[in-house]
Amino acid sequence: MRQKLEEIKNSAINELKASLSKDQLEVIRVKYLGKKGELTQILRGMGALSQEERPIVGKVANEVRSYIEETIKEAFSDIKNKEKSIRLENETIDITMPGKKQEVGKRHPLDLTLESMKDIFISMGFTIEEGPEVELDKYNFEALNIPKNHPARGEQDTFYINDNLVLRTQTSPIQIRTMENQKPPIKMIAPGKVYRSDSVDATHSPIFYQMEGLVVDKGITFSDLKGTLELFAKRMFGDKVKTKFRPHHFPFTEPSAEMDATCFVCNGEGCKVCKGSGWIELLGCGMVHPQVLRNCNIDPEVYSGFAFGFGVDRMVMMKYGIDDIRLLYESDMRFLNQF
């Protein structure tokens, strides 16, 4: 029996030395140590031995078993290390090859234009004020001299959350909140997103950016309004730009006007963008209506003011010659990389 165990041990050693893969090692393990393995069969047959032989043979059998198990374990480790070395050799990185360049993002034209507009007004002494995008009807309409059932409400398709809450249709509510919380003199701008229930096309979007401005103090006149906006236009579009004011109507200003600027595409010569007129509508403006001042507890007999409002998206389109507002919101890198 001892001789048989030595033969099994030597046979296993020779086979292990010749093995080249984990699969071959597994075959050897099953052959000698599996449930029907050669060594396992000998251990099961020890019951037929005499009491004197049993402990001697059992000791030798266990030693052979331990030796084969340890040898298989070492062989597994050696093969694993060889495979790792081969894999690392095949995966060697050539550090002399050029690396993959990281894409550098660019600022959105809306952001660039907003920053330019804010910088111009800040240099003129304006402060920046903010307000909620979900707004009370009171601030979005009533305090702006647009009571319930006023025809001006029909001009703006509004997203109503309930009877008293809306998604703001303009940043004018920030002007009301500022006049309620600050005493004149007031000189502020209110940039931000606004919402209107418009169908999406080349010139309309349900979400867009607006910037409104307000000045309230003693002795403010329409001349102050014109001077401020003409200076803004020259700083924004260059000294050659010309402006003109046309009478208009807004419920929150009186008198009201719209300011046009010479077309930035044809420089006032006439083209399809300006429809041959040489002029492009730039903004709405006017003197703050006395009732709006009263709604904010400001005495219109003592104070006067002017207000104005831009569509920032429109400014971007005019400044960069963009003919479709949807391009500003589609995240198309081919478009955005131009700026």
Curated annotation (Swiss-Prot):
GO terms for biological process: phenylalanyl-tRNA aminoacylation. Pfam families: Phe_tRNA-synt_N (PF02912), tRNA-synt_2d (PF01409). Its cofactor is Mg(2+). The keyword Protein biosynthesis applies. Binds 2 magnesium ions per tetramer. Gene3D superfamilies: Bira Bifunctional Protein, Domain 2. One of its GO terms (molecular function) is catalytic activity, acting on a protein. Mg(2+) binds at E254. InterPro entries: aa-tRNA-synth_II, aa-tRNA-synth_II/BPL/LPL, Phe-tRNA-synth_IIc_asu, Phe-tRNA_ligase_II_N, Phe_tRNA_ligase_alpha1_bac, Phenylalanyl-tRNA_Synthase, tRNA-bd_arm. Its main location: cytoplasm. It is found in: Cytoplasm. Belongs to the class-II aminoacyl-tRNA synthetase family. Phe-tRNA synthetase alpha subunit type 1 subfamily. Tetramer of two alpha and two beta subunits. NCBIfam families: pheS. This is Phenylalanine--tRNA ligase alpha subunit. It comes from Clostridium botulinum (strain 657 / Type Ba4). The gene is pheS.
